[in-house]
From Swiss-Prot:
This is Transcription initiation factor TFIID subunit 8. One of its GO terms (biological process) is cell differentiation. It is found in: Nucleus; Cytoplasm. One of its GO terms (cellular component) is transcription factor TFIID complex. Residues 226-240 have a biased composition (Acidic residues). Residues 226-293 are annotated as: Disordered. Residues 283-293 have a biased composition (Basic residues).
Length: 293
Protein backbone atom coordinates (compact mmCIF):
# COMPACT_ATOMS: atom_id res chain seq x y z
CA UNK A 1 0.00 0.00 0.00
CA UNK A 2 1.43 3.36 -1.04
CA UNK A 3 1.76 6.14 1.53
CA UNK A 4 -0.93 8.75 1.55
CA UNK A 5 0.06 12.11 0.14
CA UNK A 6 -1.16 15.13 2.06
CA UNK A 7 -2.05 17.64 -0.59
CA UNK A 8 -2.02 21.31 0.25
CA UNK A 9 -4.25 22.32 -2.63
CA UNK A 10 -6.44 20.57 -5.14
CA UNK A 11 -5.06 20.13 -8.63
CA UNK A 12 -6.87 21.88 -11.43
CA UNK A 13 -5.71 19.57 -14.24
CA UNK A 14 -6.54 15.94 -14.99
CA UNK A 15 -4.53 13.25 -16.83
CA UNK A 16 -6.89 13.48 -19.77
CA UNK A 17 -6.23 17.20 -20.15
CA UNK A 18 -2.45 17.07 -20.37
CA UNK A 19 -0.28 14.35 -21.90
CA UNK A 20 2.71 15.17 -19.70
CA UNK A 21 0.62 15.03 -16.53
CA UNK A 22 0.04 11.30 -17.03
CA UNK A 23 3.80 10.71 -17.22
CA UNK A 24 4.22 12.85 -14.12
CA UNK A 25 1.72 10.68 -12.23
CA UNK A 26 3.70 7.57 -13.16
CA UNK A 27 6.85 9.08 -11.67
CA UNK A 28 4.90 9.95 -8.52
CA UNK A 29 3.84 6.31 -8.20
CA UNK A 30 7.49 5.24 -8.48
CA UNK A 31 8.53 7.75 -5.80
CA UNK A 32 5.72 6.58 -3.51
CA UNK A 33 6.82 2.95 -3.89
CA UNK A 34 10.41 3.89 -3.04
CA UNK A 35 9.21 5.75 0.05
CA UNK A 36 7.17 2.74 1.12
CA UNK A 37 10.21 0.47 0.76
CA UNK A 38 12.18 2.93 2.89
CA UNK A 39 9.60 2.65 5.71
CA UNK A 40 7.60 5.86 5.27
CA UNK A 41 3.85 5.75 5.82
CA UNK A 42 2.96 9.26 4.65
CA UNK A 43 4.58 12.18 2.86
CA UNK A 44 3.84 15.81 2.15
CA UNK A 45 2.91 16.74 -1.39
CA UNK A 46 5.76 19.23 -1.62
CA UNK A 47 8.28 16.53 -0.66
CA UNK A 48 6.84 14.09 -3.21
CA UNK A 49 6.95 16.79 -5.90
CA UNK A 50 10.60 17.54 -5.10
CA UNK A 51 11.56 13.86 -5.29
CA UNK A 52 9.57 13.49 -8.52
CA UNK A 53 11.39 16.46 -10.03
CA UNK A 54 14.76 15.00 -9.02
CA UNK A 55 13.88 11.61 -10.54
CA UNK A 56 12.64 13.22 -13.74
CA UNK A 57 15.81 15.31 -14.08
CA UNK A 58 17.99 12.23 -13.43
CA UNK A 59 16.21 10.17 -16.09
CA UNK A 60 16.27 13.07 -18.57
CA UNK A 61 20.02 13.47 -18.08
CA UNK A 62 20.56 9.74 -18.67
CA UNK A 63 18.58 9.90 -21.90
CA UNK A 64 20.33 13.05 -23.12
CA UNK A 65 23.83 11.70 -22.42
CA UNK A 66 23.03 8.32 -24.00
CA UNK A 67 21.73 10.11 -27.10
CA UNK A 68 24.90 12.20 -27.37
CA UNK A 69 27.14 9.13 -27.08
CA UNK A 70 25.02 7.40 -29.70
CA UNK A 71 25.31 10.28 -32.16
CA UNK A 72 29.04 10.58 -31.44
CA UNK A 73 29.52 7.05 -32.80
CA UNK A 74 27.43 7.76 -35.93
CA UNK A 75 24.31 5.92 -34.76
CA UNK A 76 20.70 7.02 -34.44
CA UNK A 77 19.40 4.72 -31.68
CA UNK A 78 21.08 4.34 -28.27
CA UNK A 79 22.11 0.87 -27.10
CA UNK A 80 22.87 -0.69 -23.71
CA UNK A 81 26.60 0.21 -23.80
CA UNK A 82 25.65 3.87 -24.27
CA UNK A 83 23.51 3.77 -21.13
CA UNK A 84 26.24 1.97 -19.17
CA UNK A 85 28.81 4.60 -20.15
CA UNK A 86 26.35 7.31 -19.16
CA UNK A 87 25.75 5.80 -15.70
CA UNK A 88 29.50 5.45 -15.15
CA UNK A 89 30.07 9.08 -16.14
CA UNK A 90 27.31 10.16 -13.71
CA UNK A 91 29.04 8.27 -10.84
CA UNK A 92 26.60 5.36 -10.56
CA UNK A 93 27.85 1.87 -9.58
CA UNK A 94 26.67 -0.30 -12.44
CA UNK A 95 27.68 -3.57 -10.74
CA UNK A 96 25.08 -3.02 -7.99
CA UNK A 97 22.18 -2.99 -10.44
CA UNK A 98 21.61 -6.81 -10.58
CA UNK A 99 21.53 -7.10 -6.78
CA UNK A 100 19.13 -4.12 -6.53
CA UNK A 101 16.83 -5.61 -9.16
CA UNK A 102 16.66 -8.95 -7.28
CA UNK A 103 15.86 -7.49 -3.85
CA UNK A 104 13.11 -9.20 -1.90
CA UNK A 105 11.23 -6.09 -0.71
CA UNK A 106 10.75 -4.55 -4.12
CA UNK A 107 7.24 -3.55 -5.15
CA UNK A 108 5.81 -4.42 -8.54
CA UNK A 109 4.15 -1.52 -10.35
CA UNK A 110 1.45 -2.57 -12.73
CA UNK A 111 1.54 -1.20 -16.25
CA UNK A 112 -1.02 1.45 -17.14
CA UNK A 113 -4.04 0.18 -19.01
CA UNK A 114 -3.59 0.15 -22.77
CA UNK A 115 -6.24 2.09 -24.62
CA UNK A 116 -7.11 0.69 -27.99
CA UNK A 117 -7.61 3.03 -30.90
CA UNK A 118 -11.26 3.57 -31.79
CA UNK A 119 -12.39 1.48 -34.72
CA UNK A 120 -13.64 3.59 -37.58
CA UNK A 121 -16.76 2.15 -39.23
CA UNK A 122 -16.32 1.11 -42.83
CA UNK A 123 -19.14 3.39 -43.88
CA UNK A 124 -17.15 6.42 -42.69
CA UNK A 125 -13.81 5.40 -44.19
CA UNK A 126 -13.03 6.67 -47.68
CA UNK A 127 -10.14 5.06 -49.53
CA UNK A 128 -7.06 3.39 -48.08
CA UNK A 129 -4.93 5.13 -45.49
CA UNK A 130 -1.32 5.88 -46.34
CA UNK A 131 1.26 3.82 -44.48
CA UNK A 132 4.17 5.34 -42.58
CA UNK A 133 7.49 5.59 -44.42
CA UNK A 134 10.59 3.92 -43.02
CA UNK A 135 11.88 7.09 -41.32
CA UNK A 136 8.68 7.60 -39.24
CA UNK A 137 8.36 5.50 -36.06
CA UNK A 138 5.40 3.17 -35.76
CA UNK A 139 4.06 4.74 -32.56
CA UNK A 140 3.26 7.96 -34.40
CA UNK A 141 -0.41 8.49 -35.30
CA UNK A 142 -1.63 7.36 -38.68
CA UNK A 143 -2.13 9.65 -41.62
CA UNK A 144 -5.64 11.06 -42.02
CA UNK A 145 -8.10 9.66 -44.52
CA UNK A 146 -7.51 10.45 -48.21
CA UNK A 147 -10.65 12.58 -48.40
CA UNK A 148 -9.07 15.11 -46.04
CA UNK A 149 -6.55 16.04 -48.74
CA UNK A 150 -9.27 16.92 -51.24
CA UNK A 151 -9.65 20.66 -51.61
CA UNK A 152 -12.43 22.58 -53.31
CA UNK A 153 -11.56 26.07 -54.52
CA UNK A 154 -13.96 28.73 -53.35
CA UNK A 155 -14.86 31.82 -55.34
CA UNK A 156 -16.34 34.99 -54.02
CA UNK A 157 -19.74 35.68 -55.47
CA UNK A 158 -19.96 39.00 -57.33
CA UNK A 159 -22.07 41.66 -55.69
CA UNK A 160 -25.15 42.43 -57.78
CA UNK A 161 -27.15 44.51 -55.31
CA UNK A 162 -27.95 47.97 -56.70
CA UNK A 163 -27.58 49.73 -53.37
CA UNK A 164 -24.21 48.14 -52.65
CA UNK A 165 -22.90 49.04 -56.10
CA UNK A 166 -24.04 52.65 -55.74
CA UNK A 167 -22.40 52.93 -52.32
CA UNK A 168 -19.18 51.42 -53.66
CA UNK A 169 -19.13 53.78 -56.64
CA UNK A 170 -19.78 56.77 -54.37
CA UNK A 171 -16.97 55.79 -52.01
CA UNK A 172 -14.56 55.33 -54.92
CA UNK A 173 -15.52 58.71 -56.36
CA UNK A 174 -15.02 60.32 -52.96
CA UNK A 175 -11.59 58.71 -52.58
CA UNK A 176 -10.54 59.90 -56.03
CA UNK A 177 -11.66 63.44 -55.27
CA UNK A 178 -9.78 63.47 -51.97
CA UNK A 179 -6.63 62.14 -53.61
CA UNK A 180 -6.88 64.73 -56.38
CA UNK A 181 -7.38 67.61 -53.95
CA UNK A 182 -4.41 66.48 -51.85
CA UNK A 183 -2.25 66.26 -54.96
CA UNK A 184 -3.33 69.72 -56.09
CA UNK A 185 -2.70 71.11 -52.61
CA UNK A 186 0.83 69.68 -52.53
CA UNK A 187 1.85 70.67 -56.04
CA UNK A 188 0.09 74.00 -56.48
CA UNK A 189 -0.38 77.21 -54.55
CA UNK A 190 -2.71 77.03 -51.56
CA UNK A 191 -4.30 79.40 -49.10
CA UNK A 192 -4.80 78.64 -45.41
CA UNK A 193 -7.64 79.59 -43.09
CA UNK A 194 -5.24 79.95 -40.15
CA UNK A 195 -2.22 82.23 -40.26
CA UNK A 196 -0.26 80.33 -37.62
CA UNK A 197 -0.59 76.83 -39.07
CA UNK A 198 -0.50 76.81 -42.87
CA UNK A 199 -0.75 73.03 -43.14
CA UNK A 200 -4.23 72.85 -41.58
CA UNK A 201 -7.21 73.11 -43.93
CA UNK A 202 -5.34 74.18 -47.09
CA UNK A 203 -7.47 75.78 -49.81
CA UNK A 204 -6.58 75.50 -53.47
CA UNK A 205 -6.03 78.96 -54.90
CA UNK A 206 -8.14 79.68 -57.98
CA UNK A 207 -6.51 81.60 -60.84
CA UNK A 208 -9.08 83.32 -63.10
CA UNK A 209 -8.03 83.82 -66.72
CA UNK A 210 -7.62 87.43 -67.84
CA UNK A 211 -9.00 86.77 -71.36
CA UNK A 212 -11.23 83.70 -71.24
CA UNK A 213 -11.78 83.49 -75.04
CA UNK A 214 -8.07 83.67 -75.90
CA UNK A 215 -7.60 79.90 -75.94
CA UNK A 216 -10.29 79.51 -78.56
CA UNK A 217 -8.55 82.00 -80.88
CA UNK A 218 -5.04 80.57 -80.61
CA UNK A 219 -4.26 77.99 -83.31
CA UNK A 220 -3.39 74.48 -82.32
CA UNK A 221 -0.22 72.65 -83.38
CA UNK A 222 -2.11 70.58 -85.94
CA UNK A 223 -3.55 73.67 -87.62
CA UNK A 224 -0.11 75.34 -87.78
CA UNK A 225 1.38 72.23 -89.33
CA UNK A 226 -1.37 72.13 -91.96
CA UNK A 227 -0.80 75.82 -92.79
CA UNK A 228 2.93 75.21 -93.26
CA UNK A 229 2.24 72.25 -95.53
CA UNK A 230 -0.16 74.29 -97.69
CA UNK A 231 2.36 77.15 -97.99
CA UNK A 232 5.12 74.78 -99.13
CA UNK A 233 2.79 73.10 -101.64
CA UNK A 234 1.79 76.49 -103.09
CA UNK A 235 5.44 77.45 -103.52
CA UNK A 236 6.16 74.17 -105.30
CA UNK A 237 3.21 74.75 -107.62
CA UNK A 238 4.46 78.24 -108.45
CA UNK A 239 7.97 77.00 -109.30
CA UNK A 240 6.54 74.22 -111.45
CA UNK A 241 4.35 76.72 -113.28
CA UNK A 242 7.31 79.01 -114.01
CA UNK A 243 9.38 76.14 -115.38
CA UNK A 244 6.55 74.99 -117.59
CA UNK A 245 5.99 78.51 -118.95
CA UNK A 246 9.69 78.81 -119.86
CA UNK A 247 9.75 75.49 -121.74
CA UNK A 248 6.48 76.08 -123.56
CA UNK A 249 7.19 79.54 -125.01
CA UNK A 250 7.63 78.15 -128.55
CA UNK A 251 4.45 76.14 -128.54
CA UNK A 252 1.14 77.19 -129.96
CA UNK A 253 -1.09 79.71 -128.27
CA UNK A 254 -3.86 77.21 -127.83
CA UNK A 255 -1.63 74.91 -125.84
CA UNK A 256 -0.58 77.81 -123.60
CA UNK A 257 -4.20 78.62 -122.89
CA UNK A 258 -4.97 75.00 -122.04
CA UNK A 259 -1.94 74.73 -119.73
CA UNK A 260 -2.78 77.99 -118.01
CA UNK A 261 -6.38 76.85 -117.51
CA UNK A 262 -5.18 73.53 -116.05
CA UNK A 263 -2.82 75.31 -113.66
CA UNK A 264 -5.55 77.67 -112.59
CA UNK A 265 -7.89 74.76 -111.89
CA UNK A 266 -5.18 73.01 -109.84
CA UNK A 267 -4.52 76.16 -107.86
CA UNK A 268 -8.24 76.61 -107.24
CA UNK A 269 -8.54 73.03 -106.00
CA UNK A 270 -5.51 73.45 -103.77
CA UNK A 271 -6.97 76.64 -102.37
CA UNK A 272 -10.26 74.92 -101.65
CA UNK A 273 -8.50 72.03 -99.89
CA UNK A 274 -6.51 74.37 -97.66
CA UNK A 275 -9.54 76.19 -96.31
CA UNK A 276 -9.43 76.68 -92.53
CA UNK A 277 -12.53 76.68 -90.41
CA UNK A 278 -11.25 79.42 -88.09
CA UNK A 279 -12.12 82.76 -89.71
CA UNK A 280 -9.23 84.48 -87.93
CA UNK A 281 -6.66 82.17 -89.56
CA UNK A 282 -7.91 82.15 -93.16
CA UNK A 283 -5.59 83.79 -95.68
CA UNK A 284 -6.67 87.14 -97.08
CA UNK A 285 -8.31 86.97 -100.51
CA UNK A 286 -7.78 89.93 -102.76
CA UNK A 287 -10.80 91.07 -104.72
CA UNK A 288 -10.66 90.47 -108.47
CA UNK A 289 -10.45 93.58 -110.60
CA UNK A 290 -12.69 93.62 -113.61
CA UNK A 291 -11.06 94.93 -116.76
CA UNK A 292 -12.88 97.62 -118.62
CA UNK A 293 -13.77 96.74 -122.15
Amino acid sequence: MFPTIRSCARGTSTPADNYMLARRRTLQVVVSSLLTEAGFESAEKAAVESLTEMLQSYLSEIGRSAKSYCEHTARTQPTLPDIVVTLIEMGFNVESLPAYAKRSQRMVITAPPVTNNPVVPKALSAGQNKQHPAHIPSHFPEFPDPHTYIKTPTYREPVCDYQVLREKAASQRRDVERALTRFMAKTGETQSLFKDDTSTFPLIAARPLSIPYLNALLPSELELQQVEETDSSEQDDQTDAENLSMHLQGDEVGMEKENSSVLQQNSMKGGEETLIDNPYLRPVKKPKLRRKK
